[in-house]
Swiss-Prot record:
Subunit (UniProt): Homooctamer.
One of the protein's GO biological processes: thiazole biosynthetic process
Organismal lineage: Eukaryota, Fungi, Dikarya, Basidiomycota, Pucciniomycotina
Residues in coiled coil: none
Protein name: Thiamine thiazole synthase
Catalytic activity: [ADP-thiazole synthase]-L-cysteine + glycine + NAD(+) = [ADP-thiazole synthase]-dehydroalanine + ADP-5-ethyl-4-methylthiazole-2-carboxylate + nicotinamide + 3 H2O + 2 H(+)
Swiss-Prot/TrEMBL keywords: Cytoplasm, Iron, Metal-binding, NAD, Nucleus, Thiamine biosynthesis, Transferase
Gene3D superfamilies the UniProt entry points to: 6.10.250.2840, FAD/NAD(P)-binding domain
Location in or out of the cell: Cytoplasm; Nucleus
Species per Swiss-Prot/TrEMBL record: Puccinia graminis f. sp. tritici (strain CRL 75-36-700-3 / race SCCL) (Black stem rust fungus)
Length: 336
């Protein structure tokens, strides 16, 4: 037998007089009244000097920022070296290059607001940063402490390396970083040294928020930075991952991408550190971007090759610049 169907006649609401209802509600509230909350009374601060900031106008802040930013953009319209990506490899390259040649104008492009790439943490969001030897020598040079575990060393927190090398790089007077700025294309021109060969001659830049919204708003043209040499460490993931090697492939300047292979730490680190190189005239590639180009294994949460790939890129860059004659940021021939 089916259960009876619920109808209005079966379930009539109970009604009581308004006065009785109010009395019952008041009694219930009085019985359930919450105890008085304790009041925190802070102890008064004593013997503290008052803080009084110097006066300032809002327009002064605006002009101070705008003037310096656009002075930097004007000055760096021609650079000696552009570094794409301020992760562990890119920052290591900037440090080694800036230290070796303080006369070079080194411009760093970082698409994120926060530089550092994946080197704020170790593997799976854990803190420690593992570096296989001989990368410990670079840590010594930069001044990052670590624990020695035999064949490898451990920095207690990856952010300690990133913040240390970042502060040293940005303190160099010849280094300028534009963060929240994407490399969204490359400048490519005929190579004056090798007829019929194309040469990377700089970067096409835009603010990252603009680059990521081209699908929503048309006609948002970029800016450019001219340089005889670009060093790219754009990584392997994210919206701009491996950007430069992908652009080289799409422009028909390489046979294509090798695509990163599955993880093998030993093979991966040896390959990345030793194969960092100038893949086409004017473009040096290192770090995990190189694994996408060469089709080498990924290395996972070990960072030694990132550091030494950046350092090797700086060495390759110095040799490359020594072979060319440069006028107004463009290679015009071979060095005599």
């Amino acid at each position: 037998m089916s259960p009876p169907v619920a109808t209005e006649s079966m379930y009539k609401p109970t009604t009581i007089g308004t006065e009785a209802h109010d009395q019952a509600l008041a009694a219930m509230k009085s019985n359930q009244a919450a105890p008085a909350k304790p009041v925190f009374k802070p102890e008064p601060a004593v013997n503290l000097e008052p803080i009084k900031f110097a006066p300032i106008k809002e327009h002064q802040v605006q002009r101070a920022m705008v003037r310096r930013y656009f002075q930097d953009m004007e000055e760096r319209a021609i650079s000696d070296v552009i570094i794409v990506g301020a992760g562990s490899a890119g920052l290591s390259c900037a440090y080694a290059l800036g230290k070796a040649r303080p006369d070079l104008k080194i411009t760093i492009l970082e698409s994120n607001v926060a530089p550092g790439g994946g080197c704020w943490l170790g593997g799976q969001l854990m803190s420690a940063m593992v570096c296989r030897k001989p990368a410990d020598k670079f840590l010594d040079e930069v001044g990052v402490p670590y624990e020695d575990e035999g064949n490898f060393v451990v920095v207690k927190h990856a952010a300690l390396f990133t913040s240390t090398v970042l502060s040293k790089v940005l303190a160099m007077p010849n280094v300028k970083m534009f963060n929240a700025t994407a490399c969204e294309d490359l400048i490519i021109k005929p190579c004056p040294i090798n007829p019929g060969v194309q040469r990377v001659a700089g970067c096409v830049t835009n603010w990252t928020l603009v680059s990521l919204n081209h699908d929503h708003q048309s006609c948002m043209d970029p800016s450019t930075i001219t340089a005889p040499l670009v060093c790219s460490f754009a990584g392997h993931d994210g919206p701009f991952g491996a950007f430069c090697v992908k652009r080289i492939a799409s422009a028909g300047l390489s046979e294509g991408l090798g695509d990163m292979r599955p993880l093998d730490m030993e093979r991966a680190e040896d390959h990345i550190a030793n194969k960092t190189r100038e893949i086409v005239p004017g473009l040096i590639v290192g770090g995990m971007e190189l694994s996408e180009f060469d089709g080498s294994a990924r290395m996972g949460p070990t960072f030694g090759a990132m550091l030494l790939s950046g350092k090797r890129a700086a060495e390759v860059a110095l040799q490359s610049l020594g072979r060319v004659k440069v006028e107004e940021g463009e290679v015009v021939g071979s060095a005599k």
